[in-house]
């Protein structure tokens, strides 16, 4: 596979953009190949400027659940852009989008922002304002965006790259505990009695690789928060509208006080949201005294793309069952391939998101994820990409499927994975 044009553009870009990218994980820093410079996407395919075609299992890090450039989403955006781009003023589509999100995700109220980071940042500020407490509990390996308070023992690119330590003064009110470990949580509450405003968690972690929370863990976490007057925040930036219309909450039957959204909610455009119980949400300005603002928040183009996406998900009763069937096929056939190759591995999958871990048989938290064979995963990722299967370059990111993928696409993934295993036996 040739990447001559991509290399030229990428090298030139580094003169003007630090590292050549606007988000670190895109740089393929842990691989020996140049990141393909993408020029087009359609369905589950993306194309680079060198003319290479890939089956995409990254999907803009999970955002493109309908596939790239879904016609209904594109047409809705075209209709709007003729008359509306951004006003910094109320628009009718904000109301329609808010109503759709609240009814579909079963929350009382929602506030739109511009990214998942803004959503989690707003949720924590709101929790502190509502409870009058200062500290938050987060889990090692969970990634809640690039705001300073969340970068303590975070997943995603933070785990992969050697990054400068953040100012300890900024994170002094951030308590980090172990994912899926109730003793760790109970110890934090015991040592910080009446000081914890909220616990924030990815109910299915996606940035230490895919690692689902245990059902009983989330249930007891809900009870602990109730007991101590702390809010429970589900970060569903990845899982919101991906695992079901109600996100991961439908899988666990656990209701948080606040939930954050991103990725899918914007239909592929920059968008985030925080939603939840009315009595808490009404603390946001201008109704309450917890400040949040954004010039581009709720702009008509983003709202239109998000509305078209969620409406399409809602109107297709077989959407999630079809995705489950396809992802299940991928998991089953990969399991067979790796087993036949006598590899030690585990595949963590929830719905249409999954991660392959080599060198370990079980991954339930960040420490276990870090014990996996990172070098073998890098070799796997590089081999897959060179053979036109676009997967994350990092062990600590998830793979995703979309409605645009077919059984043939899954079979091609499995075929290349089998070739990779054969190459390792030589």
From Swiss-Prot:
PROSITE patterns: AA_TRANSFER_CLASS_3. SUPFAM superfamilies: PLP-dependent transferases. One of its GO terms (cellular component) is cytoplasm. Keywords: Cytoplasm, Isomerase, Porphyrin biosynthesis, Pyridoxal phosphate. InterPro entries: 4pyrrol_synth_GluAld_NH2Trfase, Aminotrans_3, Aminotrans_3_PPA_site, PyrdxlP-dep_Trfase, PyrdxlP-dep_Trfase_major, PyrdxlP-dep_Trfase_small. Its EC number is 5.4.3.8. Pathway: Porphyrin-containing compound metabolism; protoporphyrin-IX biosynthesis; 5-aminolevulinate from L-glutamyl-tRNA(Glu): step 2/2. Its cofactor is pyridoxal 5'-phosphate. Disulfide bonds: none annotated. GO terms for molecular function: glutamate-1-semialdehyde 2,1-aminomutase activity; pyridoxal phosphate binding; transaminase activity. It is an enzyme of class 5 (isomerase). It catalyses: (S)-4-amino-5-oxopentanoate = 5-aminolevulinate. It is found in: Cytoplasm. The modification N6-(pyridoxal phosphate)lysine is found at residue 263. Its main location: cytoplasm. One of its GO terms (biological process) is protoporphyrinogen IX biosynthetic process. Belongs to the class-III pyridoxal-phosphate-dependent aminotransferase family. HemL subfamily. Homodimer. NCBIfam families: hemL, PRK00062.1. This is Glutamate-1-semialdehyde 2,1-aminomutase.
